[in-house]
Swiss-Prot record:
Biological processes, Gene Ontology terms: D-alanine biosynthetic process; peptidoglycan biosynthetic process
Coiled-coil intervals, chain numbering: none
Amino acids binding substrate: R136, M315
Gene3D superfamilies for the chain: Alanine racemase, Lyase, Ornithine Decarboxylase, Chain A, domain 1
Protein EC: 5.1.1.1
Pathway(s) per entry: Amino-acid biosynthesis; D-alanine biosynthesis; D-alanine from L-alanine: step 1/1
Entries under HAMAP family matching the protein: Ala_racemase
InterPro entries recorded: Ala_racemase, Ala_racemase/Decarboxylase_C, Ala_racemase_C, Ala_racemase_N, Ala_racemase_pyridoxalP-BS, PLP-binding_barrel
Keywords for the protein's UniProt record, in alphabetical order: Isomerase, Pyridoxal phosphate
Reaction equations catalysed: L-alanine = D-alanine
Name under which the protein is recorded: Alanine racemase 1
């Protein structure tokens, strides 16, 4: 238990981040690697994770929104940072001030960026988004879109730094749709080349493609979930890339009580003691990202043993049954998500229980939970968001 933070924390292993990045660097055939650190590095803390990525093989970073990019710049990150999504024109001053590379998917938008850059007498670098099969932002791969991008290339104070797309099903065994997307991407790029449009980097290789599709490793690849030690699905060949999970969510036992047969635990009386039971309370709940959907289904690791989560998970607390566990004490450390010795209960396990993906599970861990950064087995930093 740490003295200056509440007894719920997420340990982030910086050595494992470095290891994963090095493994990805070896796997990727691209000269450049764009480390995706959107959503606060998938809940791991972008300001603290980004430097480790850059020290171990990443050349660039990608975020989803302008505030994420600004936070990185203010922390001292100087490498190219691109925004994968939309930025309102009302925030264009921040794009300019912090030298951010903006995604573009319409001529009108690019024209306004060009005008803003011209007024400031600077040059903006942009990335062209191409929708090859996701059905979200991006130019469609048509002759009309080729002409639109050609017009963008002629705008003043604008450099097309990159062109990119995103695979919809590259993490599935059947790669037919993925190859169809790749074909559209290559066609569009070749049409641009015919018009002598200079583009420095192409990037379409996401986590699954980095692992299984070397033909998608153009000038850059764009790893996301694999940076954080998880695979994009159970259908990818995990032998292609050895990864180490980075986050371990922990807490401490804060209360222990004996309950009699017939007594209930938590809201809704969903758990009834069928025997004399020893129940421990943990100070973690769904406001911390420990979703209520895990109620009565999850387990935790305590003193080398599993203990079931019983009753409904509350906003700030939950209960576990420790009746069959030896000598649990108030203050004992509990692993909610992660590994301890030979036991583990991971984001993959949680995702399977609640019917989602590991991405969502790790992104759910809220900023009410302090991040404790570990290097060489020692705490090197504690970040309290609130």
């Amino acid at each position: 238990m740490f003295r200056h933070i509440r007894p719920v924390w997420a340990e982030i292993d910086l050595d494992n981040i470095a290891y994963n990045m090095q493994q990805i660097r070896r796997c990727s055939k691209s000269d450049e690697i764009i480390g995706v650190v959107k959503a606060d590095a998938y809940g791991h803390g972008a300001v603290d994770v980004a430097p480790v990525l850059l020290e171990n093989g990443a050349n660039r970073l990608a975020v989803a929104v302008i505030s994420e990019a600004v936070e990185l710049r203010k922390s001292g990150i100087q490498c190219p940072i691109m925004i994968l999504g939309y930025t309102p024109l009302s925030l264009v001053d921040s794009i300019i001030k912090y030298s951010i590379e903006q995604t573009v998917f319409s001529y009108d938008y690019a024209e306004k960026l060009s005008e803003a850059a011209r007024q400031k007498n600077i040059t903006l670098r942009i990335h062209i988004a191409l929708d090859t099969g996701m059905g979200r932002i991006g130019f469609l791969p048509t002759e009309e879109s080729v002409w639109e991008v050609y017009k963008i290339s002629k705008l003043s104070n604008i450099i097309i730094e990159g062109i990119f797309s995103h695979f919809s099903t590259s993490d599935e065994t059947n790669k037919e749709y993925t190859y169809a997307q790749l074909k559209k991407f290559e066609w569009f790029y070749n049409e641009l080349r015919k018009k002598n449009i200079k583009i420095n980097i192409r990037h379409i290789g996401n986590s699954a493609a980095i692992m299984e599709l070397p033909e998608t490793h153009f000038e850059a690849t764009r790893p996301g979930i694999i940076l954080y030690g998880y695979y994009p699905s159970n259908e990818v060949d995990k032998n292609k890339l050895n990864l180490k999970p980075i986050m371990t969510l922990k807490t401490n036992v804060v209360h222990i009580k004996k309950m009699m047969p017939g007594e209930y635990v938590s809201y809704g009386r969903k758990f009834k003691c069928e025997r004399e039971s020893i129940i421990a309370t943990l100070p973690v709940g769904y406001a911390d990202g420990y979703t209520r959907m895990l109620s009565g289904k999850a387990k935790v690791i305590i003193n080398g043993n599993y203990a079931p989560v019983i009753g409904r998970i509350c906003m700030d607390q939950c209960m576990i049954d420790i009746t069959d566990l030896p000598s649990v004490q108030v203050g004992d450390e509990v692993v909610i998500m992660g590994e301890s010795d030979d036991k583990k209960f991971t984001a993959d396990d949680m995702a399977e229980i609640i019917g989602t993906i590991n991405y969502e599970v790790i992104c759910m861990i809220s900023k009410r939970v302090p991040r404790v950064y570990i290097k060489n087995g020692e705490v090197v930093k504690i970040r309290n968001y609130v």
